[in-house]
């Protein structure tokens, strides 16, 4: 080990220079030292010559001194993987931060991996049924696809993410990994407790300190962490997800927020002395994003489906950060404040959300035709809203009145009670089968349910429930 040790020569914020006597660690190797009694990991980013390497610190560098000894571990950052990570919270270097003792995984795996080769990748376009009507019908997710979740504050992003984890866990028996990149610590804490309350994860305090039986692993690098940790925590989460995929699982991988992954990369880039590119971002923006996104893919063994929350700076979609992630997305789920204001949850915008697999070749003729008819009806209603606002409903033709009535029913039928929101709403959550979703909306656009009041369609699961609710409303009115 003697020849593998070096010493710190310079500390500038999150960037630390280390000089070695003879041995020089490779780029991306993890170096270890101690700082105020804690293990500090440094990742090699550049070779400067004269046996000196420039590294990025994965934790605070306050307290480091020049001349301090540093050891080369001989490989990249290694994190525990496997079922031991489920129900636990880890940081970027795989240390537990939930005060339940260390995470002892089946194995350790390097956070930097090659993307699967062409021969390993699966080329089938297969739909991943989520049990959420609006998503399954109008912007279906594909197994192994990448979904961008666009939404402001308070429109239900976290609840939608929670419900997806819950539904996939129930319907597919699959595992989920949540990477909080530049997360608010409070939100991360809320998510952990919400998962226990909604039975996605097991409460260790009621299970002899064990989280066995949980369905979701959490990897956090919060806002207060140095940029090194925020730039790598998405890779740590992905490494945990890749292990489950290689075991033959269908994994759901959440990143909140992909913009902060880019932002952290930009902070580090400036400290490393790279010349910034457009809008001050790192020159390696597309490479960094590609290295992460190309690993999120379906292989012949299993699939990773990723849902990524994307913050758009100043609502400018042409900003280099969101633009770099757009190139990789297969589907976009847009959450709209105007829909949330109507009390329709999930507040997914049915006209703005898109999907690559909304094609008759993948989802079949019937599903495709019903989805297009639903969108046409909603689009027509949107076009008529100005006329209604100025002249009122009475000025519309009979045909347009019928379109408006159907569109309002469709709007309400796109709402659905969530399992994870049961504690707040008091109404039991619904998981709707794809065939039931198509059948319900097909009947709506064909006019089979024109006789039912629009309230009957609000916050129900299948069309049968809407008919039942309609009968109840009629009985109450009588």
UniProtKB/Swiss-Prot annotation:
Keywords: ATP synthesis, ATP-binding, Cell inner membrane, Cell membrane, CF(1), Hydrogen ion transport, Ion transport, Membrane, Nucleotide-binding, Translocase, Transport. GO terms for cellular component: plasma membrane; proton-transporting ATP synthase complex. Its EC number is 7.1.2.2. It catalyses: ATP + H2O + 4 H(+)(in) = ADP + phosphate + 5 H(+)(out). It holds the Pfam family ATP-synt_ab_N. It is found in: Cell inner membrane. F-type ATPases have 2 components, CF(1) - the catalytic core - and CF(0) - the membrane proton channel. CF(1) has five subunits: alpha(3), beta(3), gamma(1), delta(1), epsilon(1). CF(0) has three main subunits: a(1), b(2) and c(9-12). The alpha and beta chains form an alternating ring which encloses part of the gamma chain. CF(1) is attached to CF(0) by a central stalk formed by the gamma and epsilon chains, while a peripheral stalk is formed by the delta and b chains. Produces ATP from ADP in the presence of a proton gradient across the membrane. The catalytic sites are hosted primarily by the beta subunits. This is ATP synthase subunit beta. It comes from Azorhizobium caulinodans (strain ATCC 43989 / DSM 5975 / JCM 20966 / LMG 6465 / NBRC 14845 / NCIMB 13405 / ORS 571). The gene is atpD.
């Amino acid at each position: 080990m003697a020849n593998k040790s070096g010493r710190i020569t310079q500390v500038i914020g999150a960037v630390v220079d280390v000089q070695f006597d003879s041995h020089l660690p490779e780029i991306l190797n993890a170096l270890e030292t101690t700082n105020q009694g804690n293990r500090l990991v440094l990742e090699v980013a550049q070779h400067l010559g004269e046996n000196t390497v420039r590294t990025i610190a994965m934790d605070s560098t306050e307290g480091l001194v020049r001349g301090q000894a540093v050891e080369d571990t001989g490989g990249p950052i290694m994190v525990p993987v496997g079922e031991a990570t489920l129900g636990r919270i880890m940081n970027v270097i795989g240390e537990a931060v939930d005060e339940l003792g260390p995470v002892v995984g089946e194995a350790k795996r390097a956070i930097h991996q090659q993307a699967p080769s062409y021969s390993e990748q699966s080329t089938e376009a297969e739909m991943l049924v989520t049990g959420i009507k609006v998503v399954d019908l109008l912007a279906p997710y594909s197994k192994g696809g990448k979904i961008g979740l666009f939404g402001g504050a308070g429109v239900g992003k976290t609840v939608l993410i929670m419900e997806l984890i819950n539904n996939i866990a129930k319907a597919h028996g699959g595992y989920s990994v949540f990477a909080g990149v530049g997360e608010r610590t409070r939100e991360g804490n809320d998510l952990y407790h919400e998962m226990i309350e909604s039975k996605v994860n097991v409460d260790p305090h009621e299970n002899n300190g064990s989280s066995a039986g949980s369905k979701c692993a959490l990897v956090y690098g919060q806002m207060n962490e140095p940029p090194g940790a925020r730039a790598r925590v998405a890779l740590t989460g992905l490494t945990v997800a890749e292990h489950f995929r290689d075991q033959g699982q269908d994994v759901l991988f959440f990143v909140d927020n992909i913009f902060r992954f880019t932002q952290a990369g930009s902070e580090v880039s400036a400290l490393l002395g790279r010349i910034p590119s457009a809008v001050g971002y790192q020159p390696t923006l597309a490479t960094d994003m590609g290295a992460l996104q190309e690993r999120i893919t379906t292989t012949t063994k299993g699939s990773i489906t990723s849902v990524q929350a994307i913050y758009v700076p100043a609502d400018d979609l042409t900003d280099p950060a969101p633009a770099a992630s757009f190139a990789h997305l297969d589907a976009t789920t847009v959450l709209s404040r105007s829909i949330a204001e109507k009390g329709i949850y999930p507040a997914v915008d049915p006209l703005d959300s898109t999907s690559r697999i909304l094609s008759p070749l993948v989802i079949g003729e019937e599903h495709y035709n019903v989805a297009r008819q639903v969108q046409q009806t909603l689009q027509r209603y949107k076009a008529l809203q100005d006329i209604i606002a100025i002249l009122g409903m009475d000025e519309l033709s009979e045909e347009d009145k019928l379109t408006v009535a159907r569109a309002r029913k469709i709007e309400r039928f796109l709402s659905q009670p969530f399992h994870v929101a049961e504690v707040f709403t008091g109404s039991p959550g619904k998981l709707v089968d794809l065939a039931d979703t198509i059948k319900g909306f097909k009947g709506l656009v064909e006019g089979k349910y024109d006789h039912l009041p629009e309230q009957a369609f609000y916050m129900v699961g299948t069309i049968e429930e809407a008919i039942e609710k309609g009968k109840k409303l009629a009985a109450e009115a009588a």
